[in-house]
Protein backbone atom coordinates (compact mmCIF):
# COMPACT_ATOMS: atom_id res chain seq x y z
CA UNK A 1 0.00 0.00 0.00
CA UNK A 2 1.30 3.41 -0.95
CA UNK A 3 -0.14 6.29 1.07
CA UNK A 4 -0.12 9.94 -0.01
CA UNK A 5 -1.60 13.13 1.37
CA UNK A 6 -1.70 15.77 -1.41
CA UNK A 7 -4.86 14.98 -3.33
CA UNK A 8 -5.23 18.36 -5.04
CA UNK A 9 -2.14 18.28 -7.23
CA UNK A 10 -2.49 14.81 -8.72
CA UNK A 11 0.50 13.47 -6.78
CA UNK A 12 -1.12 10.13 -5.98
CA UNK A 13 -2.39 9.75 -9.53
CA UNK A 14 1.15 10.20 -10.87
CA UNK A 15 2.44 7.51 -8.50
CA UNK A 16 -0.40 5.22 -9.59
CA UNK A 17 0.23 5.78 -13.31
CA UNK A 18 3.98 5.25 -12.89
CA UNK A 19 3.47 1.94 -11.11
CA UNK A 20 0.88 0.75 -13.63
CA UNK A 21 3.24 1.52 -16.52
CA UNK A 22 6.10 -0.41 -14.89
CA UNK A 23 4.14 -3.28 -13.34
CA UNK A 24 2.09 -5.00 -16.01
CA UNK A 25 2.20 -8.22 -13.95
CA UNK A 26 0.38 -6.62 -10.98
CA UNK A 27 -3.08 -5.33 -10.28
CA UNK A 28 -2.78 -1.69 -9.24
CA UNK A 29 -5.65 0.18 -7.58
CA UNK A 30 -6.13 3.89 -6.90
CA UNK A 31 -8.32 5.32 -4.16
CA UNK A 32 -8.87 8.93 -3.18
CA UNK A 33 -11.83 10.94 -1.89
CA UNK A 34 -13.48 10.90 -5.33
CA UNK A 35 -13.46 7.09 -5.56
CA UNK A 36 -16.95 5.62 -5.20
CA UNK A 37 -17.33 3.82 -1.83
CA UNK A 38 -18.49 0.62 -3.54
CA UNK A 39 -15.35 0.66 -5.68
CA UNK A 40 -13.22 1.18 -2.57
CA UNK A 41 -14.79 -1.91 -1.03
CA UNK A 42 -14.10 -3.93 -4.18
CA UNK A 43 -10.45 -2.81 -4.24
CA UNK A 44 -9.86 -3.56 -0.56
CA UNK A 45 -11.44 -7.02 -0.94
CA UNK A 46 -9.17 -7.74 -3.91
CA UNK A 47 -6.15 -6.64 -1.87
CA UNK A 48 -7.24 -8.99 0.90
CA UNK A 49 -7.73 -11.95 -1.43
CA UNK A 50 -4.54 -11.92 -3.44
CA UNK A 51 -0.84 -11.31 -3.59
CA UNK A 52 1.31 -9.12 -5.80
CA UNK A 53 -1.20 -6.25 -5.72
CA UNK A 54 -0.57 -2.56 -5.16
CA UNK A 55 -2.93 0.03 -3.73
CA UNK A 56 -2.18 3.73 -4.04
CA UNK A 57 -4.47 5.53 -1.59
CA UNK A 58 -4.89 8.88 0.10
CA UNK A 59 -4.43 9.01 3.87
CA UNK A 60 -7.98 10.30 4.22
CA UNK A 61 -9.52 7.23 2.63
CA UNK A 62 -7.39 4.71 4.52
CA UNK A 63 -6.96 6.28 7.94
CA UNK A 64 -9.85 4.69 9.84
CA UNK A 65 -12.35 1.90 9.45
CA UNK A 66 -10.35 -0.07 6.87
CA UNK A 67 -9.08 -3.56 7.64
CA UNK A 68 -6.90 -5.32 5.08
CA UNK A 69 -4.72 -8.00 6.69
CA UNK A 70 -2.89 -8.84 3.48
CA UNK A 71 -0.68 -5.73 3.51
CA UNK A 72 3.02 -6.47 3.93
CA UNK A 73 4.55 -3.16 2.83
CA UNK A 74 3.41 0.40 3.40
CA UNK A 75 5.12 3.30 1.65
CA UNK A 76 4.68 6.72 3.24
CA UNK A 77 5.38 9.10 0.39
CA UNK A 78 4.88 12.51 1.97
CA UNK A 79 6.10 14.42 4.97
CA UNK A 80 3.77 14.80 7.93
CA UNK A 81 4.17 14.67 11.69
CA UNK A 82 0.75 13.96 13.22
CA UNK A 83 1.21 11.11 15.70
CA UNK A 84 -2.43 10.05 15.25
CA UNK A 85 -2.09 9.97 11.45
CA UNK A 86 1.18 8.05 11.67
CA UNK A 87 -0.29 5.42 14.01
CA UNK A 88 -3.40 5.06 11.84
CA UNK A 89 -1.28 4.70 8.71
CA UNK A 90 0.98 2.08 10.27
CA UNK A 91 -2.05 0.30 11.65
CA UNK A 92 -3.14 -0.49 8.07
CA UNK A 93 -0.37 -3.09 7.89
CA UNK A 94 -0.21 -4.31 11.47
CA UNK A 95 -3.11 -6.70 11.26
CA UNK A 96 -1.45 -10.08 11.61
CA UNK A 97 -2.67 -13.48 10.50
CA UNK A 98 -1.15 -16.96 10.08
CA UNK A 99 2.04 -16.59 8.08
CA UNK A 100 2.37 -12.82 8.57
CA UNK A 101 4.75 -11.75 11.29
CA UNK A 102 5.60 -8.18 10.37
CA UNK A 103 4.95 -5.26 8.08
CA UNK A 104 7.62 -3.19 6.34
CA UNK A 105 7.16 0.57 6.50
CA UNK A 106 9.12 2.57 3.95
CA UNK A 107 9.08 6.23 4.97
CA UNK A 108 10.42 8.48 2.21
CA UNK A 109 12.11 11.74 3.16
CA UNK A 110 13.42 14.38 0.78
CA UNK A 111 16.30 16.28 2.35
CA UNK A 112 16.16 19.85 1.12
CA UNK A 113 18.22 21.17 4.02
CA UNK A 114 20.35 24.15 3.12
CA UNK A 115 23.53 25.48 4.71
CA UNK A 116 23.21 23.20 7.72
CA UNK A 117 19.59 24.11 8.47
CA UNK A 118 16.90 21.44 8.39
CA UNK A 119 13.87 22.21 6.31
CA UNK A 120 10.37 21.17 7.41
CA UNK A 121 10.67 17.80 5.62
CA UNK A 122 13.65 16.85 7.79
CA UNK A 123 12.01 18.25 10.93
CA UNK A 124 8.91 16.14 10.28
CA UNK A 125 11.10 13.11 9.61
CA UNK A 126 12.88 13.52 12.94
CA UNK A 127 9.52 13.77 14.70
CA UNK A 128 8.34 10.55 13.02
CA UNK A 129 11.54 8.80 14.12
CA UNK A 130 10.79 9.82 17.71
CA UNK A 131 7.33 8.25 17.34
CA UNK A 132 8.89 5.06 15.95
CA UNK A 133 11.26 4.97 18.95
CA UNK A 134 8.46 5.62 21.43
CA UNK A 135 6.37 2.82 19.91
CA UNK A 136 9.49 0.58 19.94
CA UNK A 137 9.39 -0.09 16.21
CA UNK A 138 12.55 -1.49 14.70
CA UNK A 139 13.82 0.88 12.04
CA UNK A 140 16.81 1.52 9.81
CA UNK A 141 17.79 4.69 8.02
CA UNK A 142 19.19 4.50 4.51
CA UNK A 143 20.59 7.51 2.74
CA UNK A 144 20.24 7.37 -1.02
CA UNK A 145 22.17 9.98 -2.95
CA UNK A 146 20.66 10.96 -6.27
Please report, for each region that a protein language model flagged, where it lies by residue:
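Conserved RecA-like ASCE P-loop NTPase motor core of nucleic-acid helicases/translocases
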Residues: 1-7, 31-32
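Conserved nucleotide-binding/hydrolysis micro-motifs of P-loop NTPases
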Residues: 7-10, 61-63, 79-82, 94-95, ...
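Conserved helicase ATPase core of P-loop NTP-dependent helicases/translocases
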Residues: 10-63
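Short glycine-/polar-rich loops that comprise or flank the Walker A/P-loop
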Residues: 24-27, 69-73, 98-105, 135-137
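Short, acidic/turn-prone active-site loops that include or flank metal/cofactor-
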Residues: 33-36, 78-83
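A short beta-strand element within the Helicase C-terminal
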Residues: 56-57, 64-79, 87-88, 102-107
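Conserved segment of the helicase C-terminal RecA-like domain
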Residues: 92-128
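Charged phosphate-binding loop/patch that engages nucleotide di/tri-phosphates or the phosphate backbone
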Residues: 129, 134-146
Amino acid sequence: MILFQSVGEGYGKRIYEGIRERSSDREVYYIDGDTDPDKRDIFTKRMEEGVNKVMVASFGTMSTGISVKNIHNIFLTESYKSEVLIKQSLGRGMRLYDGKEKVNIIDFVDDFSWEGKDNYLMKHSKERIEIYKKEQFEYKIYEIKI
